[in-house]
């Protein structure tokens, strides 16, 4: 799944359309992770979209599965995790 924080942030997003605050990016990711988890879909990996495909906003690819089968489940991330991706 592609998470585009600029669409998850809502009215907090400035006129530039760029999500610059790591806390806002973290909330966007956690909102999607929480929604998926509540519906029995589990995140097992998160990474950023490579720079050459990025249009100024940092976007995230998340691997979701219905049955984790012993894989580590990611239920939430913190802003330090997001900054270091």
What are these regions (language model features)?
Residues 54-60:
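A short, glycine/Asx- and small/polar-enriched loop/turn
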Residues 1-54:
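S-adenosylmethionine
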Residues 1, 62-64:
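Preference for bulky hydrophobic residues occupying beta-strand positions
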Residues 58, 65-85:
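Flexible, glycine-/basic-rich loop-and-beta segments that form/coincide
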């Amino acid at each position: 799944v592609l998470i585009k924080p600029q669409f998850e942030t809502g009215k907090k997003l400035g006129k530039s359309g760029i999500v610059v605050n790591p806390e806002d990016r973290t909330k966007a990711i956690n909102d999607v992770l929480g929604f998926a988890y509540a519906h029995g879909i589990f995140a097992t990996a998160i990474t950023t979209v490579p720079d050459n495909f990025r249009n100024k906003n940092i976007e995230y690819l998340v691997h979701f599965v219905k049955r984790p089968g012993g894989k580590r489940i990611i239920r939430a991330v913190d802003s330090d995790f997001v900054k270091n991706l």
